[in-house]
Regions:
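Conserved PLP-enzyme active-site core in the AAT-like
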Residues: 2-50, 55-69, 88-109, 113-344, ...
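Conserved C-terminal alpha-helix-loop-beta "cap" of PLP-dependent enzymes
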Residues: 5-19, 26, 301-302, 335-449, ...
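Glycine- and acidic
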Residues: 82, 106-107, 322-323, 409-413
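Generic structural signal of hydrophobic/aromatic residues within well-ordered alpha-helices
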Residues: 33, 37, 69-74, 179, ...
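Positively charged, low-complexity intrinsically disordered leader regions
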Residues: 74-86
Length: 460
């Protein structure tokens, strides 16, 4: 987030966009929010959208659209027969493929309706039963798809990822000694792949350095192990590499993205995060045979991305790479909120790429895990302010074993202004000042049929 400098007013550029369309918000009372919490069984995920002031539940698929994206939606430039099915011979697909080659360096792309579809197809093709996948605290959907194919996941993330107070700038890095030990223990032939998530959500949106990616590439090549990336947050990761890694401060974002991809054999990604669209997933590969299998599987599963959505994705990539200020503003807003809260409130350090994470155990030390402290804190903050937080994806197994519990403040791109972040700051600071008044919750038995169903809670 830029600021005015008296000696160089030409640097003033805090917000790289102006507001073209607005959605009025309803101002709720304390009583309204009390009723909403009761109706939602104290689960903030279940609160209706019109009763929320600032929604930090997720940044996925809820970013504001640019005027160029709206133009693409209003009248596709490349409309043609069959565009709704997005055949790979269409102009929309050709345009997307060319953008992917230029920006990411992969010759083959399969565009799907969402990231988990791309993951499901890719793991089905590449992950074999009774094998091992080495990863760095992978996202729950990635873990699920790997395990559904009968493989075991070994976490080889750096130890600093488990130290919430550590200021290590690259807590998403792979521990190369752990990785080498896993290869030696299981044998390279038993390892289906090395799978690395960029800007690891589970440990606070923490990036992976390019030096680390290149070292992983060297190990993978030496042992003939495929190396894949979850590149859903590749732009955030690349921006943080530009800010934190020596030798990249003057590099263009597109160059860092390309160099990141050059380390991998393939990537899967959700387009709903960094690519600032509301639908779409990508599977990028260098291997024609794998591409053909994946393309056929996408057709069979009925998850091919429609042509209009492809065009919207191309337009978004054009916008992002034309002006790095979009990503600077996105990461800068997270950094601003983190710094506003960092003086006293227990947070994951350092600031991540897409969200601020509260250390729930340190925030509410008087509540045991059985009292659902993260859910209780989210309910309290909503009750007092109308700001919605949710616990987010389940903790990684290595975090659960250590008793770590985080509450995520995910900031959608181009949606909120500094005033909103100041209001969030006030809400969290109020909760922290009154933390000893926050009481735990009890789970209503059988309220959730599976771990993906929203649970119901009640106050004791």
């Amino acid at each position: 987030m830029g600021g005015m400098k008296a000696d160089s007013p030409g640097t003033i550029f805090s917000v790289p966009y102006e507001i073209a369309v607005v959605r009025p918000l309803r101002q709720t009372t304390l009583g309204d929010r009390d009723d909403a919490l009761r109706a939602a069984h104290y689960n903030t995920e279940l609160i209706p959208q019109d009763l929320i002031y600032i929604d930090l539940c997720t940044d996925s698929g809820v970013s504001s659209l640019s005027t160029s994206q709206l133009s693409a939606l209003a009248g596709p430039k490349f409309a043609e027969p069959g565009m709704g099915l997005a055949p790979e011979g269409s102009r929309a697909y050709a345009l997307l493929s060319e953008q992917i080659r230029q920006s990411f360096g992969f010759p083959y792309v399969v565009a799907t309706t969402q990231g988990r579809s791309a993951e499901r197809i890719w793991t089905k093709i590449n992950i074999k039963p009774d094998t091992v996948v080495a990863g760095n605290m992978l996202f729950p959907s990635t873990r699920n798809h790997i395990e559904l194919n009968g493989a075991k996941i070994i976490d080889v993330i750096t130890e600093s990822a488990h130290d919430l107070a550590s200021s290590d700038p690259f807590k998403g890095n792979v521990d190369l000694e752990k990785l080498a030990a896993a290869i030696e223990q299981h044998g390279a032939e038993k390892i289906s792949c090395i799978y690395v998530e960029l800007c690891v959500n589970a440990c606070g949106g923490q990036p992976v350095s390019l030096a680390n990616l290149k070292a992983v590439r060297t190990l993978a090549t030496a042992h003939k192990i495929p190396f894949f990336l979850d590149a859903s947050r590749i732009l955030e990761n690349s921006f943080l590499v530009k800010e934190r890694e020596r030798g990249y401060h003057d590099r263009r974002l597109r160059e860092i993205v390309s160099e990141t991809c050059a380390a991998a054999d393939a990537c899967t990604m959700s387009a709903l995060k960094d690519l600032l669209v509301s639908s779409g997933g990508l599977l990028l590969t260098r291997d024609r045979g794998s591409y053909q299998k994946a393309s056929m599987q996408a057709f069979i599963d009925g998850v091919q991305l429609p042509g209009v959505a492809m065009e919207l994705l191309v337009t978004s990539l054009d916008d992002i790479f034309a002006s790095e200020s979009t990503m600077a503003n996105r990461v800068g807003q997270v950094n601003y909120l983190w710094h506003r809260l960092s003086d006293g409130v227990p947070l994951v350090k350092p600031a991540g790429g897409h969200a601020v994470f509260l250390d729930v155990r340190a925030f509410l030390p008087h509540l045991s895990p059985e009292q659902f402290p993260a859910e209780a804190l989210a309910a309290f903050i909503y009750h007092m302010s109308g700001v919605r937080l949710t616990k987010g994806p389940p903790a990684a197994p290595s975090q659960a074993r250590r008793g770590l519990e985080l509450l995520r403040l995910a900031i959608p791109a181009r949606k909120y202004l500094r005033g909103h972040m100041d209001d969030v700051t006030e809400a969290v600071l109020y909760a922290y000042a009154h933390r000893h008044e926050i009481k735990g919750l009890k789970r209503v038995e059988d309220s959730a049929r599976s771990k993906y169903d929203p649970a119901h809670f009640r106050q004791p």
